[in-house]
Amino acid sequence: MVNSRSPYRSPLSTLGGNNIQSVVPMVVEQSGMGERAFDIYSRLLRERIIFLGTPVDDQVADSIVAQLLFLDAEDPEKDIQLYINSPGGSVYAGLAIYDTMQQIRPDVVTICFGLAASMGAFLLSGGCKGKRMALPSSRIMIHQPLGGAQGQAVEIEIQAREILYIKDRLNTMLVEHTGQPMEKLQEDTERDFFMSAEEAKEYGLIDQVISRPNLPDPTTPVTSLG
């Protein structure tokens, strides 16, 4: 099995708050037919906003892909905003999201808040060129995929070849998205490589560091930089 050496677990994640269960806020909307209650993510989906706020696995990928396809069918011309705060996860699940982002008709605006690590950083870089963003205090981290191999020698060899293929595939796409030379990218991803939002912009992973004046408005298209 190949993972992007994640979900990355920050040593800071152990500092309190572990026993608090996640609560999804509800919002109430008034209409001529009365009140309707929505969970906040469903309400934001109506504004073409998708949240990736968990590790990336098959279930999460299915949900994100379904939302992308729905919004593509609803309006192929209007931008989709994908907010990312993810430690990464399954390479295969992440590539399912990535390929869908590349194939649908609307521009996908990617926005990092918090942490985009491993596959999270890869998806961040895969947004529409000129429309990849991060909040000022965000952290972005890239590294190479890691997979475990077990079984007979021939099985280990097959899995090792797959890991090398995935590593080369991801690096090739990161070269395309960042403009960095392959040699530098290979060197940087040998270990966890952390960047601030400004450093990620200089590296080519994102195009803008968000400030209040350029905060994306879901009601209007985002102006591409570059």
Swiss-Prot record:
Q: Which catalytic reaction applies to this protein?
A: Hydrolysis of proteins to small peptides in the presence of ATP and magnesium. alpha-casein is the usual test substrate. In the absence of ATP, only oligopeptides shorter than five residues are hydrolyzed (such as succinyl-Leu-Tyr-|-NHMec, and Leu-Tyr-Leu-|-Tyr-Trp, in which cleavage of the -Tyr-|-Leu- and -Tyr-|-Trp bonds also occurs)
**What's this protein's name?**
ATP-dependent Clp protease proteolytic subunit 2
Q: Name one GO cellular component term.
A: endopeptidase Clp complex
> Per the similarity annotation, which family is this?
Belongs to the peptidase S14 family.
Q: Which GO terms describe its biological process?
A: protein quality control for misfolded or incompletely synthesized proteins
Which PANTHER family does this chain map to? ATP-DEPENDENT CLP PROTEASE PROTEOLYTIC SUBUNIT (PTHR10381:SF70)
Q: What is its EC number?
A: 3.4.21.92
Kindly list the GO molecular function terms attached to this UniProt entry.
ATP-dependent peptidase activity; ATPase binding; serine-type endopeptidase activity
State the taxonomy lineage. Answer: Bacteria, Bacillati, Cyanobacteriota, Cyanophyceae, Synechococcales
Q: Which Pfam families match?
A: CLP_protease
Q: Where in the cell is it found?
A: Cytoplasm
Q: Does the keyword Transcription apply?
A: no
* Catalytic residues (positions): S118 (nucleophile), H143
**Primary subcellular site in the record, as a coarse category:** cytoplasm
The record's annotation in PROSITE patterns points to: CLP_PROTEASE_HIS, CLP_PROTEASE_SER
Quaternary data: Fourteen ClpP subunits assemble into 2 heptameric rings which stack back to back to give a disk-like structure with a central cavity, resembling the structure of eukaryotic proteasomes.
Q: Which gene encodes it?
A: clpP2
Species the sequence originates in? Synechocystis sp. (strain ATCC 27184 / PCC 6803 / Kazusa)
Q: Which UniProt keywords apply?
A: Cytoplasm, Hydrolase, Protease, Serine protease
